[in-house]
């Protein structure tokens, strides 16, 4: 009996050692490290350090700008830079290298800086910090609950003779001409500066804090969707024209929202609208739950009037037309996934031009459900939200439908140890994704890597794990062998001395001789 108890105890200890690595995830299956990067091109020696955490309600609040459209808060935004015109409506025009709003407790705006309206040299450093309470944002952002009188009368600003008068929800435009507006809301003189070229060695350090209710109060000025709040966004740079509607026009190299547990965001930074040079390093980390991703890509629950009609863009002879919730192109890491027909290493490469010597260090972890949620923006598919995405580079055309247009010069190459293999774009070398579906989806996920720009490449080489599994299997084989030995020893035939005592009919020894 004691031998059997000892065997059971040994087996229990052995099998308790077979603990698998848990999935590297946050509290509710959030994904850490999702990074959509570098929409077009990027300047040299620029460093970004980002971190974001958004709850589902926070993301829902950022994508619902049009609840009541009886009176649109912003009628037309017309801007010209030489031959450039931008007309349309927008709740939030957040463009490139802007100083966030520094506000006091009573909601008054202190220190708004529309910086470097024409030219900005290299080696420029921005250090900003803003903290707005919900009441402050409520007081500053929804001036037009009753749209009979427009909340934005005049926003006139000039450099040298700069004057800013009027009301504005959030006019966060940096390295650009401030909005000069007339009574009917038409905007004249907006200068979106440096759409092509940006000097190198520019460092940005920003920090902002917004609660979920504050973001909610800043974005939904239009509760009724009878008339869309964004009619036309037309922009031309020489021969370039962009027209269409968009809830969120997030262009190129923006800092994702850094949020704390209560939904406050710190560090929102939209940078570098078009071009950047080489030698750019990004250190990113983000955490989004499946429901949060689902809320990002579903702005059109009621598809009777599509929120995004046309997005037409031309760069010399290049045209992009169609509808898209998220047009994330150029130098972004594609999602490597397995299991349900998910996309493993898709590389839509080099839509425009990709400079050399660009290094990306990313860590992403997406579950199957999270990936499924990012590619299902249209619950009601009667009218598809994305009709055509046509892009041409000289004679190249790409047509079709896509939720994500992810273009890059490097793949997110995942090894069996779940490390991101950084591939130099100049060498044009791609490492295939060899991780099995069981490794990616069952036992473990891609482990986020502590990215450090100063760490040598030698630190990226993982030492092989100690073969605990081999030791455990050997121990179990020995245990099973010992069990078999004990069983056969118990069941062996009795020896000759034991046969000398005959048994009677009832199984007892015959003791008559002793009597």
From Swiss-Prot:
List the residue ranges of the region (Disordered): 80-114, 314-358, 393-413
Q: Does the keyword Metal-binding apply?
A: no
Record's subcellular location: Host membrane
Presence of the UniProt keyword Signal in the record: yes
Q: Where is it predominantly found?
A: host cell
Carbohydrate attachment residues: 24, 45, 51, 60, 85, 93, 102, 123, 129, 138, 180, 201, 207, 216, 258, 279, 285, 319, 327, 336, 357, 363, 372, 397, 405, 413, 434, 441
**Keywords annotated in UniProt:** Glycoprotein, Host membrane, Host-virus interaction, Inhibition of host innate immune response by virus, Membrane, Signal, Transmembrane, Transmembrane helix, Viral immunoevasion
Topological domains annotated Extracellular: 21-467
Polar residues bias: start-end ranges? 86-104, 320-338
Membrane topology type:
Single-pass membrane protein
Q: Name one GO biological process term.
A: symbiont-mediated suppression of host innate immune response
Q: Where does the signal sequence lie?
A: 1-20
- Function of the molecule: Involved in suppression of the insect cellular immune response. Inhibits host hemocyte adhesion and phagocytosis.
Q: Which family does it belong to?
A: Belongs to the polydnaviridae Glc1.8 protein family.
What is this protein identified as? Mucin-like protein Glc1.8a
Q: Which organism is it from?
A: Microplitis demolitor bracovirus (isolate Webb) (MdBV)
